[in-house]
Structures are given as C-alpha cells and as structure tokens.
Amino acid sequence: MDLKLSEEEMLLKNAAAQFVQKELLNIEGSFLKQKEPFLPPGDPPRRELDPVVRKTLIEKAKKVGLWALELSEESGGSGLSHIARTLIHREFGKTVLPFEPPSIPRLMAASRHAERIVEGELSLSLAFDEIHKTGKLDQIRASYRPCPNGCCLNSSGIDVINPSSDFFLLPAKEETSGQSGLFLLDRDASGLSIKDEVDLTTDATVARLTLNECRISSDRLLGHEDEMRRIIAAEQLRIAARSLGIGTRCLENALEHASNRVTFGRPLSSRQAIQWMVADLSVSLRTSTWLTLEAAWKADQGLPYFDAAALAKKRAARMAFEAADVAIQIHGGYGVCKEFPFETFYREARLMRLLYGQEAGIDRAIGEIFLKAG
C-alpha cells in the first residue's frame, strides 16, 4: 500500500485547509455566539448560517474546486478520487460551521436536476433510514411495484434528516422479486407526505416520510444494489473523514489550552492525568487516520473496500466523540459553553456514531468476516 499523496491531492488538501481557515473559522465565533445572554423559555432556536453568507461561500468553494466532489466535471462537479475527498472533508470537519461540500452521488449525473443541485438552487437528502441502523441493505422496508409509465412506492414511515430538502434518494425493494432499486423522489410527489418534524441534538431536523401509492416515472429509478453500496461506503468515508477533522481540532485546542492554563502555580500540561488523556487521544487519532486512508486507497485502486469503510467510520466516529469529551474536560467550564465548539462537536459525533451502521452491527459484521477468513 502506497499512501504517498499526488501533487494534485496535496494542492487540494492545502486549498481546503486555507479555505477553512480563511472563510469558515474566521466567522465561526460569530456563528456560535448567542444573540441574547439568556435563551427564552422553551426549545432553544436552531443555529443557521445566513443564506447570503452561504451563497457567497458556495461560490468561493466552487472556484477552488471544493464543491460537488464526487460528480464528474462534465456534470458540474470536481470528479475527485476517494483519497482527495477524504482529505477535503477532514479539513471541513475542523469547524462546527454548518457548511461543507454536499453529498451528491455520482449517479445523480443522470438526473436533469443535477446542475441545479450542484448550484445550490435545489437540495438533496438521502432517505436511508433503515440502513443507518446496520449499514446493510437487508433492512430496507419501503417497497415498489411496476405500474403504467413507472413505479408505485409504499412505506409506512421513514425517518429523514433535513426533511426540507427538495429531493430524496430512497431505496426500496420490489414487492415480488425483492430486487432493490434506488429512486429519486420529489418532495411534492403525489402520495408522499412529510410530518412530525422534530429537532435533533445537532442543528438539524428529522421528520417522518410516508409513501402511499406514490407514483413516479421510470426515469426516477437511478440505480440498484451496487449503487446503494457505493453510496453507503461514500457516506461512511465522509463521516470518518469529518471525524478526523473533529479529532484534530479538539486535540490541537486541548494542547494549546493545557499549555497556557495555569492552576495552583503549574500549567495543566504538567499534570500526568492531562498527559495521559492527550497521549491516548493522539494514538486513537492516528489509528483512525490510517484506517480511513486505507479504505479510501482501496476504493481508488478498485479493491473491495466496503468493509474497510465501515470499520473506518466506526473507529473514527468514536474517536471524535472521545476527542470532544477530552477537550471539554481539559477546558473545564469553557468546554461546555456554546461559544466554544466542543459541545457541538460532542453532539455531532454522537449522531455520527449512529449513522450508516451502528457500532455493534459493524463489529458483528466485521467479526463474522474475520472468523470466516480464519
């Protein structure tokens, strides 16, 4: 395995680091700062990026090739390798600002809406609810059957993150054959309803998507099982890469604070308990980095990588959660203030541990593979 970065990959990594530092971290503080000293009674409002700021950031990201990373250049994307995408998502993971390159699967190039999604005029969400639990396709509950000029879809309810999106990519199984299909659904499609929207612990929402004889044209069937597996693996690698960014930011900030903070006449960094925490975290971060880069390298080499991506996601997301916890402990009371990023990282990392395969399910699947190989 040769993980030496190409010249293009180094340039993209540096461009992403500069973009995050100049455009995102510089405004992170104002985003985190509450407008009022005390929140009003009831649920606290969700923090959202100003639409004008978001539009400006999208234009700047597109100019430097940091947008729609997976789509080909012909479709308006960057057409980057898995390694390059991993390096870029790692840099964007260093900030809690809700801005990163969108997940637009390559198969979306076949849709007439691809260009407007890339431009940010339309939004896309992955309605992969059941797959979040195990990362496997055998949990799909939505069903479809052929009907005149297309397909009819039914589902009792699917949890969808970011339910305000214009389109949803939804996997479903054919009622008789059991063959899986991946469909592009318009939120205004007949028979599709979205209700019971609730806030997550992160600055996002989830709602229930129900399909009742939802009729769509045949051109909305974009793929089958192979395409679904590639999307799952791509999301697992994205989560793993973002987790590396979280871990790196938390470790760097924790080291800086421990060196500068003096208690009882001594810097925190001189205390053995602090030294153990940062030592363990640095080892965990390095382990997660190698697992993630190995999975991305396998994908670029055309080698089997689905299990490697799942393992990298599981290890890296847990590392990010632990990194946020360490940063909170070392920063003390500052660590849980909303004007610092660590409590947001903590909540985000906990959610990422649940997405596209929970840890127990991944452990079981990987364990079975190892036992069979032995």
PLM ranges: what are they?
Residues 1-101, 370-374:
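Amphipathic, small/basic residue-rich leader segments at the start of a protein or domain
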Residues 2-5, 87-88, 106, 331-374:
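Glycine-rich phosphate/cofactor-binding loops in nucleotide/flavin-utilizing enzymes
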Residues 2-14, 192-286, 352, 374:
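Glycine-rich beta->alpha junctions and the first turn(s) of the following alpha-helix
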Residues 28-45, 255, 259, 263-266, ...:
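C-terminal helix-coil-helix/basic helical segment that borders enzyme active sites and/or dimer interfaces
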Residues 98-116, 134-137:
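N-terminal glycine-rich flavin-associated loop
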Residues 120-131:
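A short, Trp-centered hydrophobic/proline-enriched beta-strand micro-motif
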Residues 150, 154-193:
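A short core secondary-structure module
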Residues 158-163, 239, 351-358:
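Glycine-rich phosphate/pyrophosphate-binding beta-alpha loops
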